[in-house]
Design a protein with these regions (language model features):
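Transmembrane beta-barrel strands of outer-membrane/channel proteins
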Residues: 19-23, 91-95, 152-156, 192-198, ...
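Surface-exposed coil loops of outer-membrane beta-barrel proteins
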Residues: 33-57, 67-178, 220
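Sequence/structural signature of outer-membrane beta-barrel proteins
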Residues: 26-28, 98-100, 123-125, 157-164, ...
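N-terminal regions that are enriched for targeting/export leaders
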Residues: 1-4, 8-10, 20-22
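Repeated loop/turn-to-beta-strand initiation elements of outer-membrane beta-barrel proteins
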Residues: 14-17, 66-71, 147-152, 185-192, ...
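Transmembrane beta-barrel architecture of outer membranes
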Residues: 2-4, 55, 134-138, 172-178, ...
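Long, well-ordered mid-to-C-terminal structural blocks that present hydrophobic/aromatic surfaces
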Residues: 184-284
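Residues on the lipid-exposed face of transmembrane beta-strands in outer-membrane beta-barrel proteins
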Residues: 5-9, 58-62, 93, 139-143, ...
């Protein structure tokens, strides 16, 4: 279980500061181990029997309008209502989830309102930078131009794969890039996103771990063969409204399967697709998603 506070202030026009302190308690099923596509995106990689405090987000966002048609923001969690133009630049700095900006999807991104399975909330092969709770420190910039958006980001990796502590100096880091195109088919909105990532840090190769295990007669362990390496991957993300409430979505991704994943989960290939039919009372995009990690 968790309880999260969403508090923000608007220091000047276009500027926002948000803080999300959180109280957590409990464990994922089997300590969140045993399956790469874990069935609950509300489960963290760590757990405690007693309630504990975490500062999950503390970030600054600046929106710079560049003209074009009106595209106002509506008020929601971690977002003030604001006048915006279709052409704009958005800068985000601080501690937040990589998934707050990258690989979003109207129908499959928020485990509290959409689907629960990890590779449906994010592309399973998207080894996004995060601590064990799913958040990182860094910066992202977004450039909106008509139906197009281009995004780039730089984030700290955790000190060790799946670790609780993040780097502070970008000595181990992730670079993210994304391009999005929004469209209409008939009168129904849709979008296509292509996301790429590049992780640089101390990773282990599976073949090196196996070779060492054969040589020493011990169990394979990638922690024993970690060295400075780069791991890259890419994914495609599609959403399309069918009716006012029903939509379809799909993701497909690929990453280097010879190197251990760093901060998300153990996928080298992924290709889910599904149909979203919410209950009459359900509402999508009501809160920023939690960002699960395994």
């Amino acid at each position: 279980t968790d309880a999260t506070l969403y508090a923000g202030v608007r220091p000047w026009q276009g500027g926002e500061v948000w803080i999300n302190p959180e109280m957590d308690q409990g464990f994922g099923l089997s300590n969140t181990l045993g399956v790469a596509g874990f069935p609950s995106a509300e489960a963290y990689k760590v757990g405690k029997s007693n309630p504990y405090f975490r500062l999950q987000r503390l970030f600054f966002r600046q929106t710079i309008n560049l003209g074009g048609a009106r595209d106002d923001a509506t008020a929601t969690l971690n977002q003030f209502a604001a006048r915006r133009t279709a052409d704009r630049v958005v800068l985000t700095l601080g501690k937040f989830g990589v998934g707050d900006v990258f690989d979003t999807n109207r129908y499959a991104h928020d485990p509290r309102a959409d689907f629960l399975n990890w590779p449906l909330v994010h592309a399973g092969s998207f080894d996004y930078a995060a601590d064990a709770w799913g958040y990182s420190t860094g910066a992202a910039v977004e450039w909106y131009r008509g139906p197009w958006t281009v995004r780039a980001g730089l984030f700290n990796l955790s000190k060790i794969p799946n670790g609780e502590m993040l780097e502070r100096d970008f000595s181990q880091f992730q670079l993210d890039g994304e391009i999005e195109h929004r469209h209409t088919i008939g009168d129904r909105d849709g979008a296509v996103r292509v996301t790429v990532f590049r992780n640089h840090g101390r990773f282990g190769r599976f073949d090196d771990a196996l070779a060492l295990a054969v040589k020493t007669g011990t169990a394979p362990d990638t922690a024993l063969v970690r060295d400075w390496r780069t791991r890259i991957g890419a994914s495609v993300n599609l959403e399309q409204a069918v009716t006012a409430s029903v939509g379809v979505f799909a993701r497909a991704g690929i990453a280097d399967g010879q190197i251990e994943p760093y901060d998300f989960t153990d996928f080298a290939r992924t290709a889910p697709a599904s149909l979203s039919i919410p209950r009459a009372s359900a509402r999508h995009a009501t809160r920023p998603p939690h960002h699960p990690t395994h």
